[in-house]
Amino acid sequence: MAALTIFPAIDLKAGQVVRLAEGDMDRATVYGDDPAAQARRFADAGATHLHVVDLDGAFAGASVNGAAVESIIAAFPGQVQVGGGIRDRAGVDRWLALGVARVIIGTAALKDPEFVKSAARDLPGRIVVGVDARDGMVATEGWADVSDVRVEDLARRFEDAGVAALLFTDVGRDGLLKGCNVAATVALAGVVDIPVIASGGVAGIEDIHALRPHVADGIEGVITGRALYDGRLDLAEAIAAGAA
């Protein structure tokens, strides 16, 4: 069985490394002001993949922390995926030109699905669709808005579009260390033939152990942020557990 990929997260707000509680910009905890140094620390612990979010961009609808992301890409030898504020093809192309491996598109996946499908067809393996859920419904605009579209229905729209993965985030758990919503993540993987990345609520090594058997069900990896920053999860241990 393939390994469960561990994606340490770097969320950027005004150039700083932060974590939000439930996607609320007013509930941000600052963990550092040198994103590149944080990326190097993750690499030193064995990380081969990195998940970066331009939080200001997610709310503004355009890239805001470009310089910080560039510094991360320069510092991290593995693959970097970036999301936040990517609403058009120019935004996708700009990140890819900087060396980003995969671009995550969330809000635009709901509001402009044809753009996402076109990008996925033109750029195989480079587009990840962010499926952000609050009580089973799709949340957009930095999670500030909740739509009337069910998560499964949004995912199915991209079944044959060639997207690299679906990034499923349970917004109600994100940054709260409540534990990953394994059941909902596995359920989503069960309705589409697209790899799914779990996100939101990872509290410790038990979440890695819970997700690991479901690689066979289509779970590609898991994103973890606050558990790492708060010392509740050791990255090297998580990577080893994901590969065990």
Curated annotation (Swiss-Prot):
**What are the EC numbers?**
5.3.1.16
The reaction(s) catalysed by this protein are: 1-(5-phospho-beta-D-ribosyl)-5-[(5-phospho-beta-D-ribosylamino)methylideneamino]imidazole-4-carboxamide = 5-[(5-phospho-1-deoxy-D-ribulos-1-ylimino)methylamino]-1-(5-phospho-beta-D-ribosyl)imidazole-4-carboxamide
Q: Which InterPro entries match?
A: Aldolase_TIM (IPR013785), His_biosynth (IPR006062), HisA_bact_arch (IPR006063), Isoase_HisA-like (IPR044524), Isoase_HisA-like_bact (IPR023016), RibuloseP-bd_barrel (IPR011060)
**Which molecular function term from Gene Ontology is one that the record holds?**
1-(5-phosphoribosyl)-5-[(5-phosphoribosylamino)methylideneamino]imidazole-4-carboxamide isomerase activity
The record's principal subcellular location, in a coarse class, is: cytoplasm
Q: Where in the cell is it found?
A: Cytoplasm
Tell me the protein family, please. Answer: Belongs to the HisA/HisF family.
The name on file for this protein is: 1-(5-phosphoribosyl)-5-[(5-phosphoribosylamino)methylideneamino] imidazole-4-carboxamide isomerase
Question: Per the UniProt entry, what species is this protein from, by scientific name?
Answer: Sphingopyxis alaskensis (strain DSM 13593 / LMG 18877 / RB2256)
